[in-house]
Design a protein with these regions (language model features):
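A short, gly/pro- and small-residue-rich
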Residues: 73-93, 206-215, 232-239, 268-272
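Walker A (P-loop) phosphate-binding motif
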Residues: 5, 19, 91-140
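Nucleotide phosphate-binding/pyrophosphate-handling subdomain across enzymes
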Residues: 2-4, 12, 19-23, 102, ...
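Conserved beta-strand/loop subsegment of P-loop NTPase cores
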Residues: 212-215, 246-250
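Intrinsic disorder/low-complexity segments
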Residues: 152-184
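Beta-strand->loop->alpha-helix junctions that form or flank phosphate-binding loops
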Residues: 31, 50-53, 90-96, 134-139, ...
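N-terminal leader/targeting and accessory segments in enzymes
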Residues: 1-94, 153, 247, 255, ...
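Extended acidic/charged loop-beta regions that coordinate divalent cations
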Residues: 56, 141-152, 182-219, 257-302
Length: 323
């Protein structure tokens, strides 16, 4: 399939482009303001990038237009897509349809710390040999790219493509349960900003995660949200999509998130926070600057972290990822 991505230089849409390319699609795109790190990533991936919103930038043979949320009605490219009756979809919906089915989606939501927490969680899974897929709102130094499909490949619907031949026997055997789950996790930075000009829901409601981290909640995005309550409603919609077999990892110190859970919750909740509160997961600072801390789970110390990052906020990001 050939895709044109409108708004391709945004951190989210650039990640969508990387995933589409890895899946074997032909990918091109256009944007107005193009600069690193996304411009560098797109160039390294060999993706054609055209400047500006002229409808001439969209190849006539594109099968689908993927629309970023930075584009509104009145944008020349958007108006031409609508006038021509071209097939279009939002980036969040494309991700939900093309990448997330069959995966254990781990969504990282919150006003602050999403990119850091998503990166830490992905790194932990990678270090554990899980080969996760991911979409991060930036290019993490550990990975060199903002998005990757990961090691998981769903079983083929064809004749036993997913079976492993036994050497010298011409027979096949199914992979072990553990092997079949390698790479099944997909970690996504889950943004509360709206999806597209035609879909004003928060992007994260598309992802239907098995596990959601709710890192914090403050008033933000004044251009689309009237007040904190409006953002809380979107977080409530996210909570409603997490199955009862999943988990919610919630900042136990955040009163706005407590109010979200009070609106309704059907999923087991594990709370995290710094020492001094009654949480499932606690960080006890060894160094006041956050460069060393003890991780405590249900009152039992399970290990000490020493790392180069500083600050209480980064300790909370790490604790959420570990939980």
């Amino acid at each position: 399939m050939k895709l044109h991505i409108l708004g391709i230089a945004g951190t989210f849409m650039g990640g969508v482009a990387a995933l589409a390319r890895e899946l074997g699609h032909q990918v091109e795109g256009s944007d107005q303001a193009v600069y690193p790190p996304m411009s560098t990533q797109l160039e390294q991936l060999g993706i054609v990038l055209r400047q500006g919103w002229s409808s001439d930038n969209i190849s006539a043979d594109c099968d689908q237009i993927v629309v970023g949320n930075a584009l509104s009605r009145g944008n020349p490219a958007v108006e031409q897509v609508l006038d021509d009756g071209r097939k279009y979809i939002s980036g969040a919906q494309w991700l939900a349809e093309q990448v997330l089915p069959g995966r254990d989606t781990l969504a990282v939501a919150g006003t602050h710390g999403k990119t850091t927490t998503t990166t830490i969680l992905t790194w932990l899974l990678q270090a554990a040999g899980r080969e996760p897929g991911f979409l991060i709102g930036g290019v993490a130094e550990d990975f060199g790219v903002s998005a990757r499909i990961g090691g998981y490949r769903p079983p083929s619907s064809g004749p036993s493509d997913h079976l492993l031949p036994q050497a010298g026997e011409g027979k096949t055997e199914r992979p072990s349960a553990a092997a079949s789950r390698v790479g099944r996790e997909f970690v996504v930075e889950a943004d509360e900003y709206d999806t597209a000009f035609f879909d004003k829901r928060s992007k994260f409601v598309h992802y239907r995660p098995l596990v959601a981290i709710l890192n914090n909640l403050e008033y933000d995005h004044a251009d689309i949200f009237a007040d904190v309550a409006a953002i809380q409603r979107q977080f409530h919609h996210l909570v409603r999509t997490v199955p009862r077999r999943g988990r919610l990892i919630v900042n136990g110190e955040d009163k706005h998130l407590a109010e979200v859970l009070a609106m309704g919750c059907w999923t087991p909740v594990e709370r995290f926070g710094l020492d001094g509160g009654d949480y499932d997961w606690t960080a006890r600072l060894v160094n006041d600057d956050g460069s060393a801390f003890m991780v405590v789970h249900e009152g039992v110390g399970i290990g000490e972290v020493r790392w180069p990052l500083l600050g209480r906020h980064n300790v909370m990001n790490a604790l959420a990822s570990l939980a």
